[in-house]
Amino acid sequence: PEDPQRRYQEXQREXRXQQE
């Protein structure tokens, strides 16, 4: 089963890294 929370964190991490 896919975990929405995990996908949400992954997206945030990518955005954060790009922003930094």
From Swiss-Prot:
A single GO BP: defense response to bacterium
Ordered alphabetically, the record's keywords are: Antibiotic, Antimicrobial, Fungicide
Q: What is this protein called?
A: Antifungal protein 2 large subunit
Please describe the quaternary structure of this protein: Heterodimer of a large and a small subunit.
Q: Which organism is it from?
A: Malva parviflora
Q: What is the lineage of its organism?
A: Eukaryota, Viridiplantae, Streptophyta, Embryophyta, Tracheophyta
Q: Which domain of life is it from?
A: Eukaryota
Reply yes or no: does the keyword Secreted apply: no
Mention any additional remark.
Answer: Antimicrobial activity is not affected by salt concentration.
